Amino acid sequence: MKQYLDLVRDVIDNGTLQGNRTGIRTISLPGAMLRFDLQKGFPAITTRKLAFKSAIGEMVGFLRGVKNAGEFRELGCKVWDQNANENAQWLANPFRQGHDDLGEIYGVQWRQWPGYKRIPLSNPAAIEMAEQAGFRRIAQDEEDGVAFVILYKAIDQVRQCLDTIANDPGSRRILFHGWNCAQLDEMALPPCHLLYQFHPNVETREISLTLYIRSNDLGLGTPFNLTEGAALLSLFGRLTGYTPRWFTYFIGDAHVYENHLDMLNEQLKREPLEAPKLVISDRVPAFAETGKYEPEWLEKIEPSDFWLEGYEHHAPMTAPMAV
């Protein structure tokens, strides 16, 4: 993971010290990119121990549409505890529904994006088309003398992506995101890793992923998000019969928190070790072997279905999370 260390050094050397909502200043640098060939190994940090099971637990929670810190804990991931129960802004938010509630975060938008259509009653063909696509009427009103109907559908963006990879792999529209402007105030934390675009290559039978992250804490967030993105790409490849290949990782605001500097400067002194290999349990069906498309495994997957083979790392290190 020399790329990761190079980025940390670049941000520390060339970034600007800035204030932010957390009260802990960051050294920030706009615009960064990392790119990994998953055929050469899994992008796990080795200059300290990676919290692999916690990261995978979070990814599984997202795929299940989890919106409660307690459910994340059951999956082996405790990183949402503070945002759920110690974030002053969220604690005062009327959308918060009690202890451990996180609101309409990542997985809710991924798997149950609230889609609405406002169609004039004078356009019955459009209403019929929407209803055939699974939208249902929930209200009717009138504005400026024009009567209209409101239709609603919970949209499973992740499933749509997987289906498109299986049925229309030449599409350049295979993406999902979590930036729902209408519900940002209903979330304990708006999405940082917010747009995932998949690129299946029918000629090579390889699949790649481009991930855009609006804001990335290099000390704690980046190792987690790299793990989740690479594991998700590998899972998508397994369920659709493609070999995972290129994982490209874009960051809008790459930053280092002041209270992470000691940890990161120590890591910069350590020599990165060989990349491990990701293994997915034989319990998870491989389309390349069965020829059977089984998208229900998006929900059936468990954290124990993923592990790293040949993972060696330097001594563990910790740093506080800014909330």
Curated annotation (Swiss-Prot):
Homodimer. GO terms for biological process: dTMP biosynthetic process; dTTP biosynthetic process; methylation. Catalyzes the reductive methylation of 2'-deoxyuridine-5'-monophosphate (dUMP) to 2'-deoxythymidine-5'-monophosphate (dTMP) while utilizing 5,10-methylenetetrahydrofolate (mTHF) as the methyl donor and reductant in the reaction, yielding dihydrofolate (DHF) as a by-product. This enzymatic reaction provides an intracellular de novo source of dTMP, an essential precursor for DNA biosynthesis. Disulfide bonds: none annotated. This is Thymidylate synthase. It catalyses: dUMP + (6R)-5,10-methylene-5,6,7,8-tetrahydrofolate = 7,8-dihydrofolate + dTMP. The lineage of its organism: Bacteria, Pseudomonadati, Pseudomonadota, Gammaproteobacteria, Pseudomonadales. Its EC number is 2.1.1.45. GO terms for cellular component: cytosol. It is found in: Cytoplasm. NCBIfam families: PRK13821.1, thym_sym. (6R)-5,10-methylene-5,6,7,8-tetrahydrofolate binds at D217, A322. It is an enzyme of class 2 (transferase). GO terms for molecular function: thymidylate synthase activity. Keywords: Cytoplasm, Methyltransferase, Nucleotide biosynthesis, Transferase. The active site is at C192. Pathway: Pyrimidine metabolism; dTTP biosynthesis. Belongs to the thymidylate synthase family. Bacterial-type ThyA subfamily. DUMP binds at R21, R172, R173, R214, S215, N216, D217, N225, H255, V256, Y257.
